[in-house]
Every structure is written in C-alpha cells, then in structure tokens.
Regions:
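Intrinsically disordered, low-structural-confidence terminal and linker regions
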Residues: 1-42
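Iron-sulfur-cluster electron-transfer modules
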Residues: 25-49, 57-157, 182
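Cofactor-pocket helix-loop regions in the catalytic cores of large enzyme subunits
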Residues: 1-9, 101-338
Length: 338
C-alpha cells in the first residue's frame, strides 16, 4: 500500500469547514484554552489550542476542528422543524444532520405528534421541573454524551447530586465498562497506565484493535516519531486500514513533502475475535522458550500457574485455526516482544 492518507486533503477539509463558520471564529476556536472533545489526547488545556501536553506545536487534528466548529455553526432556523416531520429526519444522513447547524432552542414532541416543536427555555424548564418533582430521584438515571465538554459534564453531575442521586453516566459506559472491569481485575486500574511521555521513550508500540488514524489522528505523530528513532510499531487489526500503513502528518514537513510517512513495521491481521488466540500463541512461545521473568511475576502478579497451564494445554492447531496467523509469524512477534 503505497498511497498515504491525510496530509493536504485534511488541510483542505479543515479550510472548507473554516470558510463556513468564518475564519475569525475558526482561529479563535483552534487557539482557545480548552481540551479536545473527540479523544483523550488533549489540546494542552491551559497551554492553549494547538499545543499539546508536552508543549509541542502545532498539534491539532481535523476531528478536533470538526467538533469544535460544529459548536459555533449558525443556529438551525425554527422553521426547519415546522417544515419537517420525524419521518423526514430519518431520511437525512448523519453527515447532513450535523451540518444543519447548531441546536440553540429546546424541542418538544407531544405523544401524538410526528414533529418536534421549538419552545422557549422557560417552558422547557417548567416541564422538566414538573417531571422531576413527581419522580423519586432513586428511580432516575441521567445519561450524557462522552463527547460533551468537561464543563458541561461537571455541571450535569453536580445537578444530579443536588437532585438526590448518583445514578449518572455517559456513553463511555457502553464503550469501556467491560474493559474497565477486566483491567481493574488484572492490573488494579480501569484506565490506561500510559502517558504521552511514555510513548516518546518507547522502542516498540503495539496498537491492538484500534484505529487511531480515524478516531485520534494525533497519535499517528507519536507512532511516526517512534519509527524515525528506530522503533517498531506493531498493528493488530483484522482490517488493513490505510492510515495505519502510511499517514501524512499535516504538521510534519518531512511527512508531507518527503514521503517519510510509514507507520506499521508489522501489520498483523487475525480473524475477527482471533486476537485472544494470537496472544495465547505469543505467550506459548515465550513460556516454551523459558523467556519468562519469574521474579517479576512472583512479585507483581497472581494466578500465573493457572494461566500458564491454560496456555500450555492450548494446542498450536487450535491457536493457528482461531487466529488465522501461522506459526512463523507468531514466532516472529514473540521475538519482537523479547
């Protein structure tokens, strides 16, 4: 795969968005002191926009630009809701819905109606208040967007606690609850243990079941830097995403002009759901070869003997069939890990 993604096309896309909302609004948005609403690789907070946590500049991505500028679009005219039914909304693509404008007035739908009706804030608050008054707080659950701002999330949880319950969560609950429980049970923390500074000192980075080129493009800068200092980037993904093979980083002139944009040193494509078998295979190679740090395991883990027994009882035939990765490639990955 020779063609790289992003680069000048991303810059062009950002400028198109800027032209719609005004270049003044665009500049104020990308240089403001805030955090990015799209992924955990933040915007530097009080260091200001386009400066990341370790003071690198310029650091920004088109997803961040799209999200921020969506918030400063022109308001959706009230007449739009009068002219369109809910059935009409179902025919509009998500992309067009996002580009309709900014929702700046409460909408109300009567049970028998097929339309949203714009109402005043006073009316909306009275309706909400009337419902809250007749509802037991312990029988309520407040669910918000993981893409809302930190300020909005703080105010919502504060309101919910004043109301009398702690039944609150956001869409990240569905995304990360399973992994959070699993991580808590195994490493003692439900969240990541890696920070940006760690990536900049890593000799090898494994990207497993993730698509940073689509969902958090700024991580690609760190992967590219790892390659340039002689490190390795191992991608484990059933889909061979172009952005994880070659990626033009818009803020990097070598990437943009010289084609220095290779990301993956190894791109491993197991069956969907075959990642467990793949990592069992890597572990089996390590155990069989005796390349295990038993002192570390005894000091910092529990249940190793049961784990090792399960690994050794799993046949190579089952591992290769389930993962769709041959023995030679599994041996190669184990050698890289060592």
């Amino acid at each position: 795969m020779k063609r790289a993604v992003s680069g000048f096309s991303s810059i062009t896309a950002a400028l198109k968005i800027a032209s719609k909302v005004g270049f003044g609004n665009f500049y104020r948005s990308i240089t403001s002191r805030n955090t990015c609403k799209t992924c955990a690789l933040g915007m530097g907070g009080q260091k200001g926009g386009m400066t990341n946590e370790v003071s690198s500049f310029p650091e920004i991505c088109k997803k961040s630009i799209q999200t921020q500028l969506t918030d400063i679009q022109q308001a959706i005219p009230e007449s739009f809701f009068q002219d369109n039914t809910i059935a009409d909304f179902k025919q509009i693509t998500p992309r067009k819905l996002e580009r309709l404008g900014r929702l700046n007035t409460p909408l109300y739908k009567k049970r028998e109606s097929n339309q949203y009706i714009p109402i005043s804030w006073n009316k909306a608050l009275k309706k909400i208040f009337a419902t809250l008054q007749t509802t037991d707080p312990e029988r309520t659950f407040f669910y918000s967007s993981g893409r809302s701002s930190n300020e909005a999330a703080f105010l919502l949880q504060l309101f919910v606690r004043v109301y009398g319950t702690n039944n609150i969560n956001n869409c990240s609950y569905y995304c990360h609850q399973a992994s959070g429980v699993g991580l808590s049970a195994t490493i003692g923390s439900g969240t990541a243990t890696v920070v940006l500074e760690d990536l900049r000192q890593s000799d090898m980075i494994w990207v497993i079941g993730a698509n940073p080129s689509s969902n958090h493009p700024r991580l690609l800068t760190e992967l590219l830097r790892c390659r340039r200092r002689g490190g390795k980037v191992i991608i484990v993904n059933p889909i061979k995403e172009p952005g994880l093979v070659r990626f033009n980083v818009p803020s990097d002139w070598r990437s943009m002009l010289l084609g220095d944009n290779e990301i993956a040193t190894d791109f491993v494509q197991p069956n969907i759901g075959g990642d467990i078998a793949l990592f069992k295979g890597i572990a089996k190679v390590l155990i069989e070869s005796g390349n295990i740090d038993m002192a570390f395991i005894e000091d910092h883990t529990s249940g190793y003997q049961g784990y090792a027994q399960d690994i050794m009882e799993t046949s190579w035939t089952d591992i290769i069939k389930s993962s769709a990765i041959d023995r030679a490639q599994i041996n190669h990955l184990a050698d890289l890990y060592l």
